[in-house]
């Protein structure tokens, strides 16, 4: 089984798809990496030679931020936004949508389950 950037690639899938199991690599980046290494995208992961796997590993490690490094960078970017107190940072801190979506209705993913407000009646 090919292990690249700490991720086991699925053996039965094509390399083009298998690489997308690595956080930070999608279809476009996967094709770009395969073009640089000269590996046929239709090759199955199980059919890759050790030389090809080492080529892939080398290119990914040198040129791209993936997995833990990328996650850390994203977390630090969000933390920085929250520290400087900009609009986006305040939205992150409040757990509300950051990119201008409406919040009067919807936004349940960011806001969590509904909190119903009870009405008190006079006795």
From Swiss-Prot:
GO terms for cellular component: cytosol; small ribosomal subunit. Located at the top of the head of the 30S subunit, it contacts several helices of the 16S rRNA. In the 70S ribosome it contacts the 23S rRNA (bridge B1a) and protein L5 of the 50S subunit (bridge B1b), connecting the 2 subunits; these bridges are implicated in subunit movement. Contacts the tRNAs in the A and P-sites. InterPro entries: Rbsml_uS13_C, Ribosomal_uS13, Ribosomal_uS13-like_H2TH, Ribosomal_uS13_bac-type, Ribosomal_uS13_CS. The gene is rpsM. Residues 94-123 are annotated as: Disordered. Gene3D superfamilies: 1.10.8.50, 30s ribosomal protein s13, domain 2. Keywords: Ribonucleoprotein, Ribosomal protein, RNA-binding, rRNA-binding, tRNA-binding. Pfam families: Ribosomal_S13. Part of the 30S ribosomal subunit. Forms a loose heterodimer with protein S19. Forms two bridges to the 50S subunit in the 70S ribosome. GO terms for molecular function: rRNA binding; structural constituent of ribosome; tRNA binding. This is Small ribosomal subunit protein uS13. Belongs to the universal ribosomal protein uS13 family. Residues 101-123 have a biased composition (Basic residues). The keyword rRNA-binding applies. The lineage of its organism: Bacteria, Bacillati, Bacillota, Clostridia, Eubacteriales. GO terms for biological process: translation.
């Amino acid at each position: 089984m090919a292990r690249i950037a700490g991720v086991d690639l699925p053996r039965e899938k094509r390399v083009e798809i298998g690489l997308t199991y690595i956080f930070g690599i999608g279809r476009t980046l996967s094709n770009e990496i395969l073009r640089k290494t000269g590996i046929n995208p239709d090759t199955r992961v199980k059919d890759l030679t050790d030389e090809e796997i080492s080529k892939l590993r080398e290119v990914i490690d040198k040129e791209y931020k993936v997995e833990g490094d990328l996650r850390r960078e994203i977390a630090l970017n969000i933390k920085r936004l929250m520290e400087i107190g900009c609009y986006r940072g305040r939205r992150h801190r409040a757990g509300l949508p950051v990119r201008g979506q409406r919040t009067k209705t919807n936004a349940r993913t960011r806001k969590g389950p509904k909190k119903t407000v009870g009405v008190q009646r006079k006795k």
